[in-house]
């Protein structure tokens, strides 16, 4: 965004969650899908937040839940402040509720966990451990996609440490609609 401020309105890093058993009180919640994301996630995707402040995603252990998940798990009770447990050891505090995503989205999830460490993503953040992240951009003008793609290689060269000069890295921006159609996920 610092390198392409006129083209990019918002950007968000997302990591799909896998492998954690999620509990509310002593009840194992089955078939729960979650993602890790940052504070810009909801603005990047244009997802309305019904309760809470998305800026609270900066706090480690924060989670925002879909309105469907909130209704299924808590009924009519207010979910704000309730605790979800991951693997019976990491506490996630519900800080907000967002409008359900459309069923045809590539990101199917019941809740969004703060990507910030304590209790969140514990993997590598360096050059050799962050290749599992998806980065999503909201462009100010969809026509700028070619301009963004033209600038990506320059940005890679600017920020890649010299020790990786012999690595071949190719990145490009594609419209989310096309990603949905070509993704193998």
What are the residue ranges of the model-derived segments?
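Short amphipathic beta-strand/extended segments in non-transmembrane regions
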Residues: 1-50
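Sequence-level motif detector for i,i+2 pairs with an aromatic at +2
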Residues: 6-9, 60, 168
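Short secondary-structure transition/capping segments
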Residues: 22-25, 60-66
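Mid-to-C-terminal secondary-structure elements
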Residues: 35-51, 63-185
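Glycine-rich loop motifs involved in handling phospho/adenylate chemistry
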Residues: 54-59
């Amino acid at each position: 965004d610092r390198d392409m401020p006129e083209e990019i309105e918002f950007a968000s890093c997302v990591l799909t969650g896998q492998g954690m058993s999620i509990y509310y009180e002593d009840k194992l919640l089955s078939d729960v899908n979650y993602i890790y994301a940052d504070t810009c996630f909801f603005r990047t995707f244009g997802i309305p937040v019904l309760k809470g402040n998305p800026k609270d995603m900066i706090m480690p252990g924060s989670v925002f839940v879909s309105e469907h998940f909130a209704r299924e798990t808590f009924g009519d009770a207010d979910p704000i402040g309730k605790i979800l447990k991951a693997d019976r050891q990491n506490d996630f505090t519900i800080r907000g509720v967002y409008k359900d995503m459309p069923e045809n989205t590539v990101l199917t999830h019941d809740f969004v966990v703060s990507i910030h460490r304590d209790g969140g993503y514990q993997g590598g953040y360096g050059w050799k451990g962050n290749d599992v992240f998806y980065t999503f951009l909201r462009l100010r003008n969809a026509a700028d996609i070619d301009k963004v793609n033209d600038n990506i290689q320059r940005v890679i060269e600017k920020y890649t440490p010299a020790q990786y000069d012999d690595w071949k890295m190719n990145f490009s921006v594609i419209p989310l609609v096309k990603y949905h159609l070509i993704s193998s996920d």
